[in-house]
Amino acid sequence: YLGSDRYRELEGGDPPIDTEGYITDEPVLIDDETIDILQETANIGILTGRPAAEASIALDRMRFSIPAAHQFTMDDWDEGKPHPWALQTLADRLEAETIVFAGDTLDDVRTAVNADTADESRTYHGVGVLTGGLSGDAGQDAFESVGAYAVIDSVNDLTDLIR
């Protein structure tokens, strides 16, 4: 995934295979216009299951500028998703009353549902995005079965939800 050079840089050893890597060719799923609208209309935080170094590369490729205090990666907390702690902490740091947390896994939605249950002072909405392993009617049903507030085809549809 990282490619040989980045693997050596980030992991500190030789990669199991010599390859260019996928990380720089991975499709960027969000349009520049969506990024602009989101940054103009909402406080943005990132909660990802990726390691910090990989998340940084992805954010740079999307040209998202998000303060470190508004980012949580797999390196930042032991529990991981769907534990609500990181999302609740982001909500505190963003001083948000309502949180829309979008992701392409069931655990993303579960994280928001769990945070909504655990934190009575805020409202959390988990939004399923059909761009990961879940797609079509089966993906829609799966997200709804774990309590999704909404299910969207693309992260670019988020702007319609938050306006």
Language-model features: where?
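Short acidic-hydrophobic, aromatic-tinged amphipathic segments that line or gate anion-handling sites
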Residues: 149-158
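Substrate-recognition "cap/lid" segment bordering the active-site pocket of phosphatases
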Residues: 24, 45-100, 106-118
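Short, acidic/turn-prone active-site loops that include or flank metal/cofactor-
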Residues: 72-79, 130-135, 157
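Acidic, Mg2+-coordinating phosphoryl-transfer loop and its flanking beta/alpha structural elements
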Residues: 101-150
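Short, charged, surface-exposed secondary-structure boundary motifs
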Residues: 77-84, 136-140, 161-163
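Short amphipathic alpha-helical segments and helix-helix/interface helices
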Residues: 32-39, 87, 91, 140-143
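Short helix-terminating capping/connector loops at secondary-structure junctions
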Residues: 38-40, 65-67, 119-124
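Short, acidic loop-to-helix structural element flanking the phosphoryl-transfer center
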Residues: 2-46, 52, 56
